[in-house]
Amino acid sequence: MSIAREFVGLPSPKLARAGAGGHPCQGLYWTKEGTRPRVALIATHYNVDFAEHYSAPYFAARGFGFLGWNTRYRGAEDLFHLEHAIADIGVGVRWLREQGVQTVVLLGNSGGGSLMAAYQAEAADKGDLYISLNAHPGRPEVLTKWMDPSVIDETDPVATDAALDPFNAASGPPFSNEFIARYRAAQVARNLRITRWAQDELKRLNAARIPDRIFPLFRTWADLRFIDPAIEPTERPCPGCYAGAPNFANRGPFGIGRTSSLRAWLSMWSLETSRCQGPPQLAKLDVPALVVQSTADMGVFPSDARKIHDSIASTDKTLTFLAGAHYFEDSEAHREAAIDLMADWIRERT
């Protein structure tokens, strides 16, 4: 059995093809050789390239089309604006319809879960089914839960409040309930402080006819669940995070939101102003929805999956837990089981 991959490059209603030739909207369409599927999935992320999404050949082998789709913000989350991303996703959905696809399944994987939910809530050409696969509830929520609240100077990666330092042995693990509550409140406070600064800085720059600027964000691998396995116990390796050992990752240059424009912060990361938060958008979803969560995920937790499931307005919604890691990369059997589960769910509704 041969799997075909077709490159798709298209302009967006809000952005034409670049002078060098690249299209703002790009991806790969995966199908079983010689077929024209009537049911297809589309998967998009805020900034990660999903053209070669791990699940694409598995779904294609089962007779579905799969469009791994990228917006203009692939690799450029520091410039993200939700309205433009929604327009770019719509280009992919319309292309699928033009190929004869009758049922479009929005696959929201990892950070893409809230993005696809926002698309479904706000776009004109909506999907017919929605799947949340090991998805974070929303972009502001995941950043806030991961950020290190012991940062006391956003311009200095070293400056630390020792009383809130999660890697200070005096704090834990194990972490006390009092420390956890104080820590979580301080994480929210950090997000709000950055939002206030971003709003004020944008006004200051605009007054000088400067439209925006980039700023760094330090230390975003500090969710206490990365360090203490007793907090929301699962089968995940702990201590650990997607970037390795949390104490080293948290001091390194790689992390979500590591650079951002002021407008991108307000559009994507802010707890106060972003429409990339899950619950408000999920509350507008009335199509059949499936929430799949793996039990050894190091960055998405059972409470996240339950929050997503509970927020979806549809009366046809299912929450399922499966063995495996975030991308089911730990086991071929886990990956096959996850794809079979989703494929069966789709077939039952098409």
Question: In which residue ranges do the predicted regions lie?
Answer:
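Catalytic histidine-centered segment of alpha/beta-hydrolase-like enzymes
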Residues: 324-337
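Alpha/beta-hydrolase-fold enzymes
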Residues: 126-241
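N-terminal cap/lid segment of alpha/beta-hydrolase-fold proteins
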Residues: 1-39, 331
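Short alpha-helix in the alpha/beta-hydrolase fold that links the catalytic acid
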Residues: 56, 145-148, 287, 301-310
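Alpha/beta-hydrolase active-site loop
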Residues: 79-99, 118
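Conserved alpha/beta-hydrolase
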Residues: 56-76
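Short beta-strand/loop motif that positions the catalytic acidic residue
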Residues: 285, 291-293, 297
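Conserved alpha/beta-hydrolase "acid-adjacent" motif
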Residues: 51, 274, 298-304
